[in-house]
Regions:
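A generic structural signal for short, non-catalytic loop/turn and secondary-structure boundary residues
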Residues: 13-16, 44, 140, 156-158
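Acidic, glycine-rich flexible loop/linker segments
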Residues: 124-202
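N-terminal, positively charged, Ser/Thr/Ala/Gly-biased leader segments
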Residues: 2-38, 175-203
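Short, acidic Gly/Pro/Ser/Thr-rich loop/turn segments
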Residues: 28-30, 41, 154, 170
Length: 203
């Protein structure tokens, strides 16, 4: 069934340079990221309009003007900078789908919920953990922030900030490998190993 699979279905992660969107909240859970009433949708696309729905809209579905995503100056931002323990709560992957579909490709926070962190890499989103003081500084960054994944560095107008990521997770994003592609790569390596490790027959 997968004989013709190309091995790449996510977009390869390239350098990103945009202004940041500051979300000054801690313990943002997955139900706040995308409310449960929208989980019946099964396609990954289309969730962007439901991102932070209860914060973006009032009971009449009018935009709340005091919410950061409704500020026009952040409309083209691809970088969300937020508080600790982002993505906590239930393990719904829809939360990452909503962030990615809205346009966020990088999330910067002091810490993430473990399952949310893993789900980011499955969907082409880069989660970056930095010290809280640095995160607070980036929330108030007036210029553009550049994300250079290959060299693992963030660049502001005045400084370069290194960040950590595992070599495997880095490869997943740089090559745009989804879970199926990762599995096929592993199968190829296992087959190659078995081919060169056959036990000789015993006479």
């Amino acid at each position: 069934m997968l004989d013709n699979w190309t091995g790449i279905s996510m977009e390869a992660f390239k350098k990103i340079k945009t202004i940041v969107t500051p979300l000054d909240q801690i313990n943002v859970d997955t139900d706040q990221i995308v409310p449960k009433q929208f989980l019946k949708l099964i396609q990954k696309s289309g969730f962007g309009k439901y991102l932070f729905y209860d914060w973006r809209y009032d009971e009449n579905e009018n935009q709340k003007q005091d919410f950061v995503l409704n500020d026009k100056k952040y409309q083209n931002s691809k970088i969300l900078v937020t508080g600790e323990n982002f993505g906590c709560g239930s393990s719904r992957e829809h939360a990452v789908w909503a962030l990615q579909d809205y346009g966020f490709l990088v999330i910067i926070a002091p810490s993430f919920a473990d399952i949310f962190y893993s789900n980011c890499f499955k969907n082409g989103v880069l989660p970056i953990e930095l010290e809280e003081r640095m995160v607070e500084k980036l929330k108030h960054e007036s210029g553009e922030l550049e994300i250079d994944l290959e060299n693992q560095v963030l660049k502001t107008k005045t400084e370069e900030i290194p960040f950590e990521i595992s070599p495997y997770q880095k490869m997943i994003l740089l090559e745009g490998l989804d879970e199926i592609a990762q599995t096929l790569q592993l199968e190829d390596k296992i087959s190659e190993f078995e081919k060169h490790s056959k036990i000789p027959s015993v006479l």
